[in-house]
Amino acid sequence: MAAMGPKTEQMSHRAARSPFNRFKHFPLALCLSAAAMWLGAPRSGVAQVSYVARFSLENPTYLAGEPIFCKFTIQNAGTQVFSFSYRTPSRALNPDLESEPRFSIRDQQGRSLPDPAPKPCGGAKGTTVYGSVRLPPGQTHTERWLLNQWAGFSSPGRYRVHAERRLPLLAFDVSKPDISGPPVAYALAINELALEIAPSTPDQLQKAFQPYLKTLEKRAGPEAGEALLVLATLPQPFTLKKLAALARAPAAKRGLDRQQALEGLARLGTREAWEEILKVARGLQAAPPNSLPAAKPEEDSLRAYAVLLLGEKGDAAFLPALLEMLPSASETPRGEALRALGLFNDPRANQALFETLRSPAANDRVNSVLGLRNLGSKEVIPALIATLSDPDAQVRQVGNFALQGLTGQKIRLPQNASPAASQHTAEQWHAWWRKQGADFTAIQLPPCRDW
């Protein structure tokens, strides 16, 4: 069905007692498509922005543990070229971004399935980089979204998917290189879809993953990126070697997101998977001497991400390796290791953080302060107050930031504060600590991920 006219959006809805009864009376997908908005006054010869947009499932039945893709299509049904934002279809950390699809999944009893997405660290919603798509009249654009990123279909049964998207459409002007400006219309798609999950055997599941494993042999192109997303979202014991190989591949040869491969190993969660992450953290996949100049920063960034995962896991078995790498690691993984030490809540880690507060390197002192903040203990308050006397201005600012985060107090340290002003702020903190320290409970940071 379609609604025609300026800024018109219509959708019919049929009430039903059971969430699945509606599918007995009309097609499985409740499709909303619209043709909306003329540019200028509605007169003959004026180009019209018109579209048809919908979600659909590729199959009615899937095996338990199998990747489930929901397809989004938009067709330019008008006479005006339009553009819209586009990126590789993977779930964004920020759910409030305007162009992103939204999925909610319920079981046969109407219960919402748990959302497996990680909570934004420290409340940050992250950023997303978009490209753009130019869609001439008559052409269709298609995206495949992996539904397993929004729900874990762990049990056989019937499920209902509510899929929704409101995509801003921009007028395309060949004389202008960018597509900035207000939308001329919004492509709205709202669909109710149903699927069934059937029991699976290990052999069936391994067969279902073979196309993705074969695609990853190419290590390039959007198909390989989609295959890696599948393995990282739904890791299986038989995908361990492939994920480990992708994570440890030299930067110049990878062509794929190695951090995503590390996430897949962490999500798999076996002892062997975590050992592979530890190897990356220790730099055992270091770039060869004749690698490109950009390789070492990329390797350092990858090592730092592996260290972060180890910290989020918080297993004391990883702690000796992190402590061992502190003296020799380069700045990026070393800084991540110091911050991660606070996540272990272990006396050995705490001692290393307190000792590093006396490091001659200001960056080390900054990261030690952040590590103590991650510890989330009132015992670190005196040491953090002492950082307000540090000779480095950044250390003082980060120290005050950590104190605010631990206590909830709004004692401010002005930007570019002089040592004298910092000392005044330190005196305010000392007064607060003497008055309330005995009864104070530190504010705990929620975990970013539960590996």
Report the location of each language-model feature.
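Low-complexity, acidic Ser/Thr/Pro/Gly-rich terminal tails and inter-domain linkers that flank the onset
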Residues: 45-63
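Asparagine-centered strand-capping/turn motif at beta-strand->loop junctions
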Residues: 74-78
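The feature marks short-to-medium sequence segments in extracytoplasmic or secretory-pathway proteins
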Residues: 84-135
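Internal, hydrophobic beta-strand segments that form the core of beta-sheet-rich folds
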Residues: 141-171
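Short beta-strand elements
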Residues: 172-209
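Amphipathic alpha-helical scaffolding segments comprising HEAT/armadillo-like alpha-solenoid repeats
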Residues: 202-213, 236-250, 270-293, 315-327, ...
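Short inter-helical turns and helix N-cap capping residues of alpha-solenoid HEAT/ARM repeat scaffolds
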Residues: 220, 251-254, 285, 299, ...
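Residue-level detector of extended alpha-helical repeat arrays and alpha-solenoid scaffolds
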Residues: 224, 254-258, 300-303, 334, ...
